[in-house]
From Swiss-Prot:
Residue ranges, annotated region (Helicase): 828-1084
Source organism superkingdom: Viruses
Record note on quaternary structure: Heterodimer of a large and a small subunit.
Stretches assigned to the (+)RNA virus helicase C-terminal domain: 963-1115
Protein name listed in UniProt: Replicase large subunit
SUPFAM superfamilies documented for this protein: DNA/RNA polymerases, P-loop containing nucleoside triphosphate hydrolases
Domain Alphavirus-like MT: 72-281
GO biological process, one term: DNA-templated transcription
């Protein structure tokens, strides 16, 4: 049922998001009605006032534990154990809810005052005075009654009617309301009116002996007893103290006495009998007589309170016979094995049974014990040699995970130390879904050693028993006993010398001279028991008379059938109808017939409409065939008519709600006719190849208007160009649920690429002659209607509407042949802070009869019309409130209208040229542009189209400021004062509203386990798609919700890499932080500037919040000049320090990494359940369990603790996780990019920036034939670089045909790459993947690209640019040696995450254009291109096969040089390369030196929208390139290896032996040569501190690295 409701709700939400406005309105109305019904249902719940003062967390606990009540938290009373005291009233009301209203009820030990206040005159309270505390409680209840009455008297009020009868009974016959006897001795004999009798017990069962309960209940003829009491499962174990943390209670046990009290409070203890309490928990049947028995049934556990009920059963119902009691002696003796007191009690309980012939078995109901087991822990005293044992509750999954894993250990590896290491590791961290690392099992650290010993003993004995089953022992000089104990002693050592004697005494083993018997102890014990009873009499089960209820139900059913003929009968309020019939004593059937007759106009009473809506009024007042024509007459002047047709005709309009459909259809047809000029227009005539070279002249406003017109043409050009390329490239289709494009094959009448949207307005058509044209499309059965000469049709999301076409047509028509002119109207900018009421001000100032309102979106337009017309007077319509697109697209279709004033809402989000056109075309005298200068401005999403920075400024005549926000809470207003000039104030009463939560990763986000409140917002489109794929609904980006208001907002960031739009000054942060009115919460996976901002707002003092006014202070960077030597000195670094220095430095730079126990991460990922989101792929599950390998080499253990991991083994799960992280879920950040034209422009920029002009002629640039690229020498150069085995594999290759070039193999690297950050503490690092071609393909293309690379590098300006290919550290130093430290420079680094899988079709187009200009053969280039478009990956080791589109393959011949070329081209397209001092590129790393003060574009935005890169631009003092710090000084530069990276490698866990260790040392010593020069250690400290903020001065550790790397013996001391 839940699934059906969820599916219906999802379908309804999909309908709301549709494009049919009428269906949308109906769906929204349905959602609204559903919400109202839910709230009404919740309002009907019983209301409880919770006056005790508790915190927010406790408030949430109470609300979730008792959803049956509508609880109001007043927090007006401070009291001891406030939560427990407040819960007592809720527990009482919950128990009384189970009792039928008005039935005689006995409250055992109850609160008679509470029942009086509720008016329950049918409750009798047994309140015995067992001690002085009971007397005091009784007196307190009397005082509460007296206080209540005196308060009423002081206010001259009388008792409410519902309380009078109860108080009257208490006044006249108090013995019927309360008595001082125990329930067993209660003398009350109130008459029950023939109904059933009930009883409740709220925390009073402890004082009633369990053996007397049944008889006492039967004496009062109680049918059901509902009880509540505190209990903890741990009390069944041998523990002396148990805590109830939620309510703060403590159970303490001493023998049979159990005490209950509250921690940290001076209240008295409550003492009870432990054995009596145990009976209530463990027993199921409580005998009352030889016939009746009360059966206990647990109901639920809420906030440490157990609820149960005892129901009276007649045993004669089952069998005829007599009740008897007997003793099962065997059960008694077996239960008495241990001599503890509580075991005696349980033995007595198990021996005394009621026997049932059906042998029914019942398990105890322990909610906390689900999947929990009791594990024994053993210990031995070294002095007395006495064995001790205790029990603990542990997760069953934890026990089996440990036992199953250590059972795979070989005999030498099965030691106590290894078992303890694994137990400690998986207790601290478990890998969840191959992504997140967190603690999964809550096991006390103090028990780990004892539990490890238990697991070790169990496994050791199990292995010995298995060996005995396989074969018998062969006697030798040693006895069999000695062989076994030698085996155990090798694992245990000398830790437990009396272990053998302890096991013999326990009888776990027994032996003789010739044989050995081993009994493996139970791994754990579960909670269970069996109950058997026997009955021999049989009677009929008593029945309840429900004939009256059935009769009433039948009459209402008949009435409902009568009402079902009504329109919208599903919305008929049956509850109100039933209440009306009950109050007026009316037969429901008769009432239903009257209602149907009235609503069907058959009763003589006419209802013209059901609701006073415009549509129903028009329907009721419209003329019929025989009615006279109704005219307005003299009343026309007094009626506000906005339709010109109404004024002309003078007759009542005949348009209702449905008339909008025909109107919309008419407008669309007219639009198509006006756009016929585009139909069958050649695509080449629309595509512009010179977007980037447009020159504008004239005043700035005229230039902006020209730029806006050109941007529309550029957008249309880019869309047409991409569709043209798509229709030509598509040969084989693919099905993608998120495809934004579509290609239709006319001959096959099928979609080769099926788009997500339907009914596109236009597209690009390819005819059979290969030419492409634009076409306006029509559809039949969701398929386009095509001409006979059409071959294919390409569409995309940009071709859904005629927006750009229509706007471009209107603007060009309005311009004509005359130069563009600017309107003389006065333009006023209303600059308001978020939530200042800009829309409200527009509605207040506008005169809809002569003014025009324009808004960006149709939702905003509908909202303005609704608010303007809410009084019932229709003043706003489609003529005076429009969207900007609608105004521009439909201009000129009707008579020319001149408006007096123009109001543009959110005008700063528009292109400034668009605003000037709106002012000009509206013919207004004055224009008001409402916006926010600090929020998100206009963003140019057409890449390679010029939009200079100065074009973004809107030129106005006057600026008005609004600095009072009506929406933002006070703490957010404090932040606004830092962003705006002038004092920002607020009218909101909400003081504190912001909060944050750092989540463990994207895998944590799930709408079931982690529901988010309010509106869900993200910064990026990729995070939005991730949230939608996770199951969240109604997710938007910050840019999409600008201008909207929500009560609660949940802002989510799932991208761990830096995002340029998240900074304290970012307008995106400002928009995201100012959308809420009550509550804002930020969920992030990393600590970013917004986290710092939210924490600062949480710490603002109340004094500042009361003033809500802060002066803005501009922060200035303190500049300190460095001290440099006059020349590049070499000072030999002394060799000093020890291993502790290396460990200290590592822990300061990366705190916490050295404490991570990640040795068994791969094991826990394979052992635990996993849920992965994968693309379409084929999995061979026969490869899921790899064959075990006997690895005799044990790796050496490093002395230095780092985050290094052990090598991992390949397998289905490990390889699949690596493939998901490295190849799947590629980002989709790019905007609209004209692939071919933009790639050509980028290639031009690449060659102009990096190549020497005089060497261009020396390479093959422009030689498209590529005939001179490959010769014998080029082939020999390539073969010299290959291994002999590679050349040998090519010996049998005939080179007649090519293998499948789109087929790749996939493997993983066994050693994870270390990250120099803290991510290892919460993440599971994925392995690096290698995707490679066969050797045969590499033999053909390897020499080609090797020669192309050689020629390209030979023509590059090596004095300014370094392409890091096969360069030594000395050559890097030489390249940077001419840097001048006296020249102010900016050091830029572009950090790109997910570099390989972010590369899409555009990157391929850029790379192929560069190779083409370098002279590659066209045929081979096309072959290579097709091999990188749609590729198939096969992992034979793991059994995985999948398909990928584009992406950079990590193992083909162009991986390194291709990545280097792409990052260089990316930087060339964004930076002024003609000003660059130095630049270096290597793979995805880049380092650029620019003069100080250069104007830079928005690098991050361009990298996102054009290059699809999640990039972050860093500006530093010193460069960091390929794991090395570039330290420049006054006359040169020195390149230091990253010392932290060297220390991290010293914690390697893959070193097998000393020979391997020596090779490792030599490798590290080679890359660390520069550390021998200590002359520039001070500058190196500054460079390291730029990257790692917590790094201390490190000269001592640099010297220590030199010391250990230079000496073989010292280096060997770092491993053992």
């Amino acid at each position: 049922m839940a699934h059906i409701q969820q599916s219906m709700q999802g379908a309804l939400l999909d309908t709301v998001r549709g494009q049919n406005s009428l269906v949308n309105d109906l769906a929204k109305r349905r959602l609204y009605d559903t919400a109202v019904e839910e709230f009404n249902a919740k309002d009907r719940r019983p209301k409880i006032n919770f006056s005790k003062s508790i915190n927010e967390e406790q408030t949430l606990i109470v609300s979730q534990a008792y959803p049956e009540f509508q609880i109001t938290f007043y927090n007006t009373q401070l009291a001891v154990h406030s939560l427990a005291a407040g819960l007592r009233s809720l527990e009482l009301e919950y128990l009384m809810m189970q009792v039928p209203y008005g039935s005689l009820t006995y409250d055992i030990g109850g609160n008679f005052a509470a029942h009086l206040f509720k008016g329950r005159d049918y409750v009798h309270c047994c309140m015995p005075n067992l001690d002085l505390r009971d007397i005091m409680r009784h007196e307190n209840q009397k005082d509460s009654v007296a206080t209540y009455l005196s308060r009423l008297k002081a206010r001259n009020k009388v008792l409410p009617a519902f309380q009078q009868e109860a108080f009257q009974r208490y006044s006249e016959r108090s013995d019927e309301v309360v008595c001082n006897n125990t329930f067993q001795c209660c003398e009350s004999n109130r008459y029950s009116s023939g109904g059933r009798v009930y009883a409740i017990s709220l925390h009073s069962l402890y004082d009633i002996p369990a053996d007397e309960l049944g008889a006492a209940l039967l004496r009062k003829n109680v049918h059901t007893l509902y009880a509540a009491f505190h209990f903890a499962e741990e009390l069944l174990l041998e523990v002396s103290t148990v805590e109830l943390p939620t309510i703060g209670g403590i159970f303490s046990r001493d023998g049979d006495k159990i005490n209950f009290c509250f921690s940290n409070e001076s209240t008295l203890n409550y003492s009870h009998s432990y054995s009596n309490l145990l009976k209530y928990v463990c027993k199921t049947y409580f005998p009352a007589s030889n016939r009746f028995v009360y059966m206990k049934e647990f109901l639920i556990t809420r906030v440490n309170t157990w609820f149960c009920k005892f129901t009276k059963l007649d045993t004669y119902t089952l069998y005829r016979g007599v009740y008897h009691r007997g003793c099962d002696q065997q059960e008694f003796y077996s239960a008495m094995e241990d001599a503890w007191h509580y075991k005696k009690t349980l033995a007595m309980l198990n021996s005394e049974r009621i026997v049932l012939e059906d042998h029914s078995s019942v398990n105890y109901w322990f909610p906390k014990m689900k999947d929990m087991v009791i594990v024994p822990l053993f210990d031995v005293s070294l002095e007395t040699q006495k064995r001790t044992k205790k029990e603990v509750i542990v997760s069953k999954d934890f026990v089996y995970t440990v036992l199953n894993h250590i059972r795979t250990y070989q005999a030498k590896a099965l030691t106590y130390n290894n078992v303890l290491s694994f137990v400690e590791s998986i207790r601290s961290r478990v890998i969840i879904n191959g992504v997140t690392a967190r603690s999964e099992w809550d096991v006390d650290k103090a028990l780990l050693q004892s539990m490890a010993m238990t697991f070790f003993l169990i496994t050791k004995l199990s292995m010995l028993k298995d060996e005995l089953l396989v074969s018998k022992f062969t006697l030798s000089a040693k006895s069999v006993h000695e062989h076994v104990w030698d085996e155990i002693k090798r694992g245990c050592g000398n830790m437990f010398p009396s272990l053998k004697e302890s096991l013999l005494r326990k009888k776990l083993i027994s032996g003789s001279a010739e044989e050995l018997e081993i009994e493996v102890p139970d791994m754990y014990v579960t909670f269970h028991d069996r109950f058997v009873a026997e009955y021999k009499a049989s009677v009929e089960m008593p029945t309840i008379d429900i004939s009256k209820d059935l009769s009433e139900a039948e009459s209402y059913y008949s009435a409902l059938s009568e009402l079902s003929v009504l329109e919208n009968s599903k919305d008929f309020d049956l509850e109100k109808f039933s209440r009306m019939c009950a109050i007026n004593c009316v037969n429901p059937d008769i009432a239903a017939k009257i209602v149907v007759a009235v609503l069907s106009n058959e009763s003589g009473v006419t209802l013209p409409f059901k609701e006073p809506t415009e549509g129903n009024m028009a329907e009721a007042m419209k003329s019929g065939e025989k009615d006279e024509v109704l005219t307005l007459g003299s009343q026309t002047d007094n009626t506000d008519l906005t339709s010109k047709s109404m004024v002309i005709s003078g007759s009542l309009p005949l348009c209702g709600i449905a008339s909008e459909i025909s109107c919309d259809t008419f407008v669309r047809n007219e639009e198509i006719n006006s756009l016929e000029e585009y139909h069958m227009l050649a695509a080449e005539s629309v595509i512009s190849n010179k977007m980037a070279s447009i020159v504008y002249s004239g005043p700035l406003q005229v230039q902006q208007m020209q730029n806006y017109v050109d941007s529309l043409a550029a957008s249309l050009s880019a869309t047409v160009s991409n569709l043209k390329k798509l229709v030509k490239d598509s040969s084989v289709g693919f099905q993608d649920s998120l495809s934004k494009v579509g290609v239709f094959d006319v001959r096959k009448k099928m979609w080769l690429i099926k788009p997500t949207l339907k009914n596109h307005s236009w597209g690009v058509v390819q005819k059979f002659d290969g030419k492409c044209f634009l076409a306006l499309l029509s559809y039949h059965n969701e398929l386009p209607i095509c001409d006979a000469d059409w071959s294919k049709v390409a569409v995309s999301n940009e071709s859904m509407v005629y927006s750009d076409m229509a706007k471009l047509r209107v603007l060009r028509k309005s311009i004509g042949e005359m130069p563009i002119s600017v309107s003389s109207a006065k333009v006023t900018l209303v600059d308001g802070v978020p939530g200042c009421g800009k829309t409200k001000e527009i509605l207040r100032r506008v005169n809809f009869s002569e003014d025009l309102v324009l808004v960006p979106g149709k939702e905003a337009a509908a909202m303005i019309r609704k608010r303007a017309n809410q009084s019932g007077n229709i003043v706003a319509n489609n003529d005076n409130v429009k969207t900007v697109d609608s105004f521009l697209m439909n201009l000129g279709k009707g008579p020319v209208c001149q408006f007096k004033r123009l109001f543009v809402d959110e005008g700063l989000m528009l292109h400034p040229g668009c605003v000037y056109f709106l002012v000009k075309l509206s013919l207004c005298n004055e224009a008001f542009v409402f916006g926010d200068t600090q929020q998100i401005p206009y963003i140019n999403r057409v890449q390679n189209f010029p939009f200079p920075q100065h074009f973004s400024k809107l030129i106005v005549d006057e600026t008005e400021k609004r600095r009072t926000t009506l929406r933002c809470p006070v703490d957010v207003t404090h932040f606004l004062n830092q962003c705006y000039d002038g004092a920002v104030t607020t009218t909101s009463k909400t003081q504190r509203s912001v909060g944050l939560e750092v989540v463990g990763g994207a895998a944590v986000m799930n709408p079931v386990t982690k529901p988010l409140k309010g509106k869900i917002v993200t910064f990026t489109q990729s995070d939005k798609l991730t949230m939608l794929s996770r199951g969240y609904q109604d997710v938007n980006t910050v840019h999409e919700i600008q201008g909207e208001t929500y009560e609660e907002v949940s802002l989510v960031r799932l991208t761990p890499t830096p995002i340029h739009i998240i900074s304290r000054e970012s307008p995106h942060v400002l928009v995201g932080l100012t959308r809420h009115t009550r509550c804002f919460k930020y969920y992030t996976v990393v600590l970013d500037p917004l986290v710092k901002l939210v924490r600062d707002l949480e710490c603002v003092s109340n004094f500042l919040l009361d003033v809500y006014m802060v002066d803005s202070v501009s922060a200035x960077q303190l500049q300190v000049s460095g001290v440099y030597l006059a020349e590049n000195l070499f000072v030999q670094a002394p060799k000093s320090g020890d291993a502790q220095d290396l460990q200290f430095y590592y822990d300061k730079c990366l705190p916490g990494n050295s404490t991570v126990l990640n040795e068994f991460d791969a094991v826990t990922m394979n052992c635990s359940d996993i849920s992965l989101n994968v693309k379409d792929c084929v999995l061979d599950f026969s490869k899921s369990v790899p064959l075990p390998r006997d690895n005799t080499k044990v790796p050496m253990t490093p002395v230095i603790r780092t985050a290094a991991e052990r090598p991992r083994s390949q397998g289905l799960l490990e390889n699949l996780v690596a493939m998901i992280k490295r190849n799947f879920n590629s980002p989709e950040l790019s905007g609209t990019v004209d692939m071919e034209n933009t790639a050509s422009v980028v290639a031009d920029r690449f060659f102009d920036s990096y190549f020497l002009k005089d060497k261009l002629s020396g390479c093959s640039l422009g030689d498209s034939g590529g005939k001179n690229i490959i010769d014998r020498q080029a082939l020999i150069r390539w073969m010299e670089k290959q291994e002999k085995s590679t050349i040998g594999q090519l010996a049998d290759y005939d080179f007649v045909d090519l293998p499948a070039i789109d087929q790749y193999r996939h493997i993983i690297k066994s050693q994870p790459k270390q990250k120099l950050d803290l991510s290892i503490q919460s993440e599971y690092p994925s392995l690096q993947t290698i995707v490679y071609h066969s050797k045969k393909i590499n033999a053909l293309f390897g020499p080609i690209f090797s020669e192309l690379t050689r020629q390209m590098l030979s023509a590059i300006d090596t004095s300014r640019y370094l392409f890091f290919t096969r360069k030594t550290p000395e050559q890097i130093e030489e390249f940077f040696s001419d840097l001048d430290a006296h020249q102010p420079m900016e050091v830029l680094e572009l950090d790109v995450s997910k570099y390989d899988k972010s590369q899409n079709e555009f990157h391929c187009a850029v790379e192929y254009e560069i190779w083409k200009r370098l002279g590659i053969d066209e045929f081979l280039a096309e072959v290579w291109k097709q091999g990188h478009r749609k590729t198939t990956l096969k992992d034979y080791t793991a059994g995985i096969k999948t398909c990928l589109w584009y992406q950079r393959k990590s193992g083909d011949v162009t991986t390194f040089i291709g990545n280097t070329v792409i990052i260089a081209a990316c930087m060339a397209s964004m930076l002024p390369m003609e000003k660059v001092i130095k630049a270096a590129f290597c793979g995805d790393d880049s380092l650029v030196y620019l003069p100080k003060g250069c104007e830079l574009p928005n690098i991050q935005s361009c990298a996102n929208l054009m290059w699809n890169f999640e990039a972050k631009l860093f500006k530093k003092t010193y460069g960091y390139f390929c794991g090395r710090y570039v330290i420049h000084h006054d006359r040169g530069a020195i390149v230091y290896v990253d010392p932290l990276k060297i220390i991290s490698k010293l914690g390697a866990k893959h070193i097998t032996d000393k020979e391997h260790l020596e090779e490792f040392r030599i490798s590290l010593a080679d890359v660390s040569k520069s550390l021998n020069n200590c002359a520039y250690y001070a500058q190196l400290d500054e460079a390291v501190r730029e990257v790692h903020k917590t790094a201390p001065p490190g000269s001592f550790v640099y010297k220590c690295i030199v010391k250990f790397l230079s000496n073989r013996v010292l280096f060997e001391s770092l491993f053992f």
